[in-house]
Amino acid sequence: MSELRGSWDEQQQSMAYLPDADMDTVAASTSLPDPAGDFDRNVPRICGVCGDRATGFHFNAMTCEGCKGFFRRSMKRKAMFTCPFNGDCKITKDNRRHCQACRLKRCVDIGMMKEFILTDEEVQRKREMILKRKEEEALKESLKPKLSEEQQKVIDTLLEAHHKTFDTTYSDFNKFRPPVRSKFSSRMATHSSSVVSQDFSSEDSNDVFGSDAFAAFPEPMEPQMFSNLDLSEESDESPSMNIELPHLPMLPHLADLVSYSIQKVIGFAKMIPGFRDLTAEDQIALLKSSAIEVIMLRSNQSFTMEDMSWTCGSNDFKYKVSDVTQAGHSMDLLEPLVKFQVGLKKLNLHEEEHVLLMAICILSPDRPGVQDTSLVESIQDRLSDILQTYIRCRHPPPGSRLLYAKMIQKLADLRSLNEEHSKQYRCLSFQPEHSMQLTPLVLEVFGNEIS
């Protein structure tokens, strides 16, 4: 009996932490959960005493509420009943009040035990435990960070901006110069592609060209936005810039794709709360420096880890590493790019986190050419605060663990990718037969990059 009482006390303590428990009902009933889930929820449960609809296990037996209460009252009063008939009455829902003796006998026969009935002290203790639990839950909820109405509005604005500048059908790709894939170049790039897809378990990588796929329908690019801007810089003559590049059959198509993506990045940036408060010169400086990084971020939506490619609709617009090599880029960019894409994909970001990360990337006060760094920093800090609050409120563990730090690390990785892209772009653009394939927008945005 002591073992039974001990196990019962343990059960009472665990039951006190069941959420949304009705205090009086739980305290009085001492109902048990269905053993091992043996009962199908869709099958009606029958009271073992009277045949009425059962509500669960009460005092170690499946009974209805009426028989549960009858047994509890009888045991507490130590009632002694006598059957007025032959002591073998059949108890039903309709006649269960007629013979209390046979009803109580039936309760005992199906396994109901008085040891499962709480004493008055236990009832009080249970009520106190339930009340304490509710108070703890209320305190926990009150201390939980919440997105303010203003913060939610910023997120909604960024989501709308992304949806307006991201065409998931990729229908505009048909307007680009068609992709031309050289079989010879493809064979040359096959080894490179296989190397890239081998061991990307924990690192991240990301691609400019895959990203263009995400750009969608915002407002058309305004060429004058980038005109008359003097961001001249000395040309870093490096050995790679003197390399003679072969025929690049994919360059025209991917140049159009990147140009299209730049337009979408501009459309997205113009809708970031606070961006239009900056001077036109600072807006241009931020866009020119961050465009390729945001394109890489956007491209993650179409990136597929199964074959390390960017799938943008039909097979014509499925881009592999070999396609990008046929546009003039080498594995010095593509290998870390794919690693970046894999790492970013594994973070399983919510769309809200993704758009906030893009906005934070654009609003970086340390971009070259930015004049009002204080204003840019204040806008970025606001976006960072919203991102951290969102993660605490809306991103459940374990995915939320160190998520903000991991996202910020992705921005650092993008800087390295940006620098390598600049080097390879210069090498490409210095050869007239290749630079003539680029669009005016690409030439304007990447032409004066500061690496």
From Swiss-Prot:
Zn(2+) 1 binds at C47, C50, C64, C67. Residues 44-112 bind DNA. Residues 113-149, 120-149 are annotated as: Hinge. Zn(2+) 2 binds at C83, C89, C99, C102. Calcitriol binds at S261, R298, S302, H329, H421. Residues 150-447 form the NR LBD domain. GO terms for biological process: calcium ion transport; cell differentiation; intracellular receptor signaling pathway; negative regulation of transcription by RNA polymerase II; positive regulation of transcription by RNA polymerase II; response to vitamin D; vitamin D receptor signaling pathway. A motif (9aaTAD) lies at residues 440-448. It is found in: Nucleus; Cytoplasm. Pfam families: Hormone_recep, zf-C4. Expressed in kidney and intestine. A zinc finger (NR C4-type) spans 47-67, 83-107. Nuclear receptor for calcitriol, the active form of vitamin D3 which mediates the action of this vitamin on cells. Enters the nucleus upon vitamin D3 binding where it forms heterodimers with the retinoid X receptor/RXR. The VDR-RXR heterodimers bind to specific response elements on DNA and activate the transcription of vitamin D3-responsive target genes. Plays a central role in calcium homeostasis. Also functions as a receptor for the secondary bile acid lithocholic acid (LCA) and its metabolites. Belongs to the nuclear hormone receptor family. NR1 subfamily. Homodimer in the absence of bound vitamin D3. Heterodimer with RXRA after vitamin D3 binding. PANTHER family: NUCLEAR HORMONE RECEPTOR (PTHR24082), VITAMIN D3 RECEPTOR (PTHR24082:SF38). This is Vitamin D3 receptor. It comes from Gallus gallus.
